[in-house]
Amino acid sequence: TAGAQQAISIGLMATLAMGDKILVEEPGYRQVHKIIDLLRLDLDGVSVREKVGLDIEKVLSSNAKALYVTPSNQYPMGTTLNTEQRLKLIDWANQHQSWIIEDDYDSEFQFAHRPYTSMQGLAGKLGFDDRIIYVGSLSKVMFNGLRLGYLVVPESLVAKCLEIKDALTGDTVSHTQEALADFVRE
C-alpha cells in the first residue's frame, strides 16, 4: 500500500459498515480518527495510561465491531501490551466476532525488553487469526519518504482488500517496491 495509513483505511473499509462501533486508543494516532470520521464509524475511545497501558477491561466489556490498537509501542504513550493482554484481546475478538486492526507501529524499536510476538502471530498459532488485520510500514525502519505499507489479512478478506486497493489507487508504485526488494536482498 501507499503507507500504513492507506493499509488501515483498506482494512477498515473491508470489515466495517457505516455506524459500526470501533474502539480506539486515547490518546492515540490522530490520523485514524480522520479515517473513522470519513467512513462514518462510531468511535469509542479507550484510555491508555502511562505505565499501565490500554484499559483492557473496557475492551473486554464492549460489544464493538472492531478495535484499533498499537500493541507493541503505543503511540504516543510508548506502552506495550504483554502476551497475556494480547491473548485476552484475541479471545474477546473471537467471542464477539469483532475485528482487531493491529498497527505494529515501531515494533522493531524495543529497548526495555525483547519484542513480543504480534497479536496476529499469536492468534495464528492458536488458529484464531481470522479476526485480525495486521498493518505495518516500511517507512519507520527504512526511511520516511518511502511510503510503503502493508497489511496481512485473513484469506476471506484478500479479494475484498485487493478490490478496495485497486479502486482507491490502483497499483502501488512498482519501482519503489522493486528498489526496496533489491535493498533487502543485498
Residues of each region from the PLM?
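PLP-dependent aminotransferase class I/II
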Residues: 131-186
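Conserved core of the PLP fold type I
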Residues: 1-97, 101, 108-109, 114-127, ...
